[in-house]
A protein has these predicted regions:
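Sec-dependent signal peptide recognition
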Residues: 2-10
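First exposed extracellular module after export/assembly in secreted or surface-exposed proteins
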Residues: 27-170
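C-terminal motif of bacterial Sec signal peptides marking the signal peptidase cleavage site
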Residues: 15-19
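Bacterial signal peptide processing site
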Residues: 21-23
Length: 170
């Protein structure tokens, strides 16, 4: 009987130690391209941003890139959190080249179409205001409900850096 109790206790102890094993979270398929970004929007007219820097006078604001619900490596979401044009659109992406685009993508925030071209993420591609290297993002956008095209600009250029956590970079 003593051996049976000892065996039961040993089995219970072994099971309790096994249940303490923590399983880390898995990475999403677009983890290298996903993030929080501080961007500025410039107008582009004839390939130049001259005189069209920070076109709307907003300075830098936050956008997000993240995986879709399907969590496949060839698509991700670009979302401005309502900070600028109120858009959330699914784009096609190439995680190896870190590029992305969409033509007439459905805006999930309200009924409109969004075209994003020449989207790219460059690892350590820029310096933040604090002097730290950070990933750089750049893409061009045309909204189908933008009344200022083509009178004032051809498209909008979003560019900026990945969130670093440093106060001086916010």
């Amino acid at each position: 009987m003593k051996k049976l109790i000892l065996f039961a206790f040993a089995a219970l102890a072994a099971l309790s130690f096994a249940s303490c094993e923590k399983i880390g979270p898995g990475m999403t398929e677009t983890a290298d391209m996903a993030g929080q970004w501080y961007v500025q929007v410039d107008g582009v007219q004839g390939g130049s941003t001259d005189g069209l820097e920070d076109l709307y006078g907003m300075g830098r604001f936050i956008i997000l890139t993240h995986n879709t619900a399907a969590n496949i490596p060839t698509e991700m979401m670009v979302n401005d959190l309502g900070s600028f044009w109120d858009f959330s659109v699914k784009v096609q992406c190439n995680p190896d080249a870190k590029t992305f685009s969409v033509t007439d993508g459905e805006n999930l925030s309200y009924e409109s179409k969004v075209t994003i071209t020449d989207g790219k993420i460059v690892p350590n591609g820029t310096m933040t205001p604090s002097g730290m290297p950070a990933d750089y993002i750049e893409f061009y956008v045309v909204f189908d409900d933008d009344d200022y095209i083509p009178d004032y600009y051809d498209k909008l250029k979003f560019s900026g850096w990945r969130y670093t956590g440093f106060v001086n970079d916010d």
